[in-house]
Amino acid sequence: MSEFKRIPPEQALALRAQGAVVVDIRDPQAYAAGHIAGARHLDNHSVADFIRNADLDAPTLVVCYHGNSSQSAAAYLVGQGFSDVYSVDGGFELWRSTYPDETAQGTPE
């Protein structure tokens, strides 16, 4: 894949169930208040370590608030060598309203 794909929450849920990596690029306070269960918080400070330790061929889902900022972050990851990147349309807000039981709270790991 030479560029990322935009996908709806339903497809993201299926990919997540198959083991896709989920990264949340919202601010730490928003992440702590609620995020997709199993998502890793990613910001300017943690992205280098994430890239260094990542499987570049693993499906990677990028989530933001509403599905806009995640597109830029997904494009960045593709530029860093990731081959299977998805931006989740509607972001966490749509995910939370669609799958409230698939969310978690707490601070980044």
Curated annotation (Swiss-Prot):
It catalyses: thiosulfate + hydrogen cyanide = thiocyanate + sulfite + 2 H(+); thiosulfate + [thioredoxin]-dithiol = [thioredoxin]-disulfide + hydrogen sulfide + sulfite + 2 H(+). Its main location: cytoplasm. GO terms for cellular component: cytoplasm. The active site is at C64 (cysteine persulfide intermediate). Its EC number is 2.8.1.1. CDD domains: GlpE_ST (cd01444). One of its GO terms (biological process) is glycerol metabolic process. Residues 16-104 form the Rhodanese domain. It is an enzyme of class 2 (transferase). SMART domains: RHOD. InterPro entries: GlpE_sulfurtransferase, Rhodanese-like_dom, Rhodanese-like_dom_sf, Thiosulf_sulfurTrfase. Keywords: Cytoplasm, Transferase. GO terms for molecular function: thiosulfate-cyanide sulfurtransferase activity. It is found in: Cytoplasm. The keyword Protein biosynthesis does not apply. Belongs to the GlpE family. NCBIfam families: PRK00162.1. Transferase that catalyzes the transfer of sulfur from thiosulfate to thiophilic acceptors such as cyanide or dithiols. May function in a CysM-independent thiosulfate assimilation pathway by catalyzing the conversion of thiosulfate to sulfite, which can then be used for L-cysteine biosynthesis. This is Thiosulfate sulfurtransferase GlpE. The gene is glpE.
